[in-house]
Amino acid sequence: MERLPYEIVSTIFRKAILHYVLIRGTTYPQSLAENLNISKGLASSFLRLCSALNIMKRERAGHKVLYSFTSKGLAILKRLAPEIFDLSFSSVFEQLPKKKIATKYYPVDKIGFEISWKEDKLGGIVFSFFDSNGEHLGDVFRSNKGYWWCVICQSDTCKHIDYLKRLYKTLKNQD
């Protein structure tokens, strides 16, 4: 019984499902299956398992079943898989072979995040993170002297900054 919570985060696809539910807040198995392009049965059975382990709560809305996280479930997931809470979770997939991360299984444009940037008046750059609905999540600043600051994490070293440093180097190399 102690091993069961570890099974919830045992595969990258299960982590993608949990990441999707975390971003959306609540979800139906049907919308999960459509957006991640997986079978409805897989989504439904996995969400039922999470519900049985009290990681998610299951509610009826008419003839549909709605799933959302419980506070206990969020605490368990923060301990077992803290990477799914990071908005740059898609960077986890950079280490996997391309066949496993095809957009068929993980459409980042639907459940990931977008980044826009602009130069400020002092010569620095402001990187803004947006979720898939276009809501502003936070900013990361890079000064003209090369110092970084993440408003989201209130830190100068985090996954957001690491991701943006790689992106910034890639963009500089293209110029």
UniProtKB/Swiss-Prot annotation:
Entries under InterPro entries matching the protein: WH-like_DNA-bd_sf, WH_DNA-bd_sf
SUPFAM superfamilies in the cross-refs: Winged helix' DNA-binding domain (SSF46785)
Keywords: Signal
Residues making up the signal peptide according to the UniProt record: 1-33
Protein name per the record: Uncharacterized protein MJ0773
Taxonomic classification: Archaea, Methanobacteriati, Methanobacteriota, Methanomada group, Methanococci
